[in-house]
Amino acid sequence: MPGDQVILLSLMALGVVARNALIVTAAGVVLILRVLALERFFPLLERRGLEAGLIFLLIAVLVPFATGEVGWAEIRQSFTSWTGLAAILGGIIAAVLSGYGVTLLQVKPEVIVGMVVGTILGVVLFKGIPVGPLAAAGFTAILLALVRGH
């Protein structure tokens, strides 16, 4: 069995042990594509997979606006409460960190391997959620800056 398939099966096993359906499903889909010799879809998934995932995430977040569960009162409150202001600041920080992440990935694309391993360990061992390579790269960029002292 080729090494890439062993890695994907190992990831699936880790996901099963950790009871994480996301890792099991993702590794399983990639493994099936590989076994069925459908690698031609890999570049598309690499280029557009994150974008598609973010679109679905945003759709899920926007549904409460469409259902009326969140309206103008809640929007106004986000600008006038400590919780709302903290959420706005959190969003700004996340966007800035993701910007640092893009820069890091452009300058040192090899960090993606460590980030993937770290993300898997975080999901499997600490019940984390894979937030995506831009956020992980942003945190990595900050950690590198702290270690290097600039």
UniProtKB/Swiss-Prot annotation:
Keywords: Cell membrane, Membrane, Transmembrane, Transmembrane helix. Disulfide bonds: none annotated. The chain crosses the membrane at residues 13-33, 52-72, 85-105, 111-131. Pfam families: DUF441. It is found in: Cell membrane. InterPro entries: UPF0756_TM. It is a multi-pass membrane protein. GO terms for cellular component: plasma membrane. The keyword Phosphoprotein does not apply. Belongs to the UPF0756 family. This is UPF0756 membrane protein STH2648. It comes from Symbiobacterium thermophilum (strain DSM 24528 / JCM 14929 / IAM 14863 / T).
